[in-house]
Amino acid sequence: MEENYRRYPIGIQNFEQLRNRNCVYVDKTELVYRLANTDSVYFLSRPRRFGKSLLVSTLEAYFQGKKDLFKGLAMERLEKDWNVYPVFHIDFSLTKYTTLFDLQEQLNLFLLRCEKVYGAEKEEKTPAARLQGMIRRAYEQTGLPVVVLIDEYDAPLLDSNFNIPLQQELRNELRKFFSPLKGLGQYLRFLFITGISKFSQMSIFSELNNLKNISMRDDFSAICGITERELLDALRPDIERMALANGETYEAACAHLKRQYDGYHFSKHCEDIYNPFSLFNAFDAKEYKNFWFSTGTPTFLIDLLQETDFDVRQLEGVEATDEQFDAPTERVTSPIPVLYQSGYLTIKGYDPEFQVYRLAYPNGEVRKGFIESLLPAYLELPGQSSTFYVVSFIRDLRKGDIESCLERTRSFFASIPNDLENKTEKHYQTIFYLLFRLMGMYVDSEVKSAVGRADVVIKMQDAIYVLEFKYDGTAREALAQINSRLYAVPYRKDGRRIVKVGINFDSATRTIGDWVIEVEDTVDNL
């Protein structure tokens, strides 16, 4: 094996397998030890592919006393006793749930597997009774309290988002199955539940009034994912190889990784967290691709945005309260908590006076991927079409050919299906926003987010384009607004040529009607 070869834990969610294969592991065992020895009943919410299952597997190995797996890690010096507890681990992500039988079968397989070890009693007919009896017998046979690990508890409910009657059946089945846990405290050493949705939203563990939710706590905010300190300390060789493969400096590679995969915050004062799935895939491929987003298209979330008529332009910075995060899913009126828990938005700030969180896209990977998914939904065109147009727009601008760029924009809107003809001004504003925001993934562009700014500013190597749109107005009015409101003034000292473009959008033809271009060639020294 090459001296510099590194095996990354891509697709490996089992701690024992990861350690035996000598995969790269960022040591989280000090947090695991604190979690296991501070309290006994926990819940953790994190987005998909963020390390929840590996964390659960690490807890399983710890409670099973597998000391050898922790050699060289913080746990080796922290743990002295290494007791071997009976561990019941159920992972709900192992199958898809399209019927109630799918869930019942999964529960039965789990119970049968455990009953082979601890036995069964014929009086125990229901899954809940079997679970209760199994925990009691495990305690009696070993003399040690039981550890229960429930991974991705909400997988059945997320699979049934589009089938509300089925979702209610699945919710009731899960609620019945886990109901005995409340009365089994004397037999339990540790209970840990993970999922994407907060447990209070799904109304499954409502009877567990001692369940401690650590999802938004500072002290456990880094238990999943990779902090910037961990990246620079433990993964420095990987950054160096990444830089070498892409012909850039170490510092440039750090900046590229941060821009693409960093930016997650799961509490008020959380340090920056990198997406581990994307980071390890990037190191393995030595490319800055959109790895996390490519593993799942957020169809449900896009439908929710459209059903609630949410203005997607607000996703660059929107506020939410604690109460919104806790709203039951059947009463959700805002898509924001769902977008946060799914990983498409993250905490970017907190106002303690009003107890309000500011949320936004975490990083470039998520912003680009989500916008690329949103555009087809608003255009009713294939996603590749919008991306192809954006690339063509950029090529036109790099050649300084603003006329061709605008002609291409006109053709783009003309290609939108006729059934959008009754859409409102807001709908077309959203399309413009998404189109130019996607362009911002490739070039330096700004899209209007406040009064007193131009609709779009695009910065190319030799020119800055200031664009203003009017809906059923005139191009001259749009240009006049650029001049009267001094939209171009902040860029005059830049030294690049300033191109001001007034554009009219014609609702009758559903595309750009006309435009006016005005060029400033000299630097204003005001």
Segments from the language model and where they lie:
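C-terminal amphipathic alpha-helical interaction region
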Residues: 444-450, 456-460, 491
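Domain-level recognition of nuclease-like catalytic cores that cleave nucleotide substrates
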Residues: 490, 494-526
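Phosphate-binding site recognition
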Residues: 1-424, 439
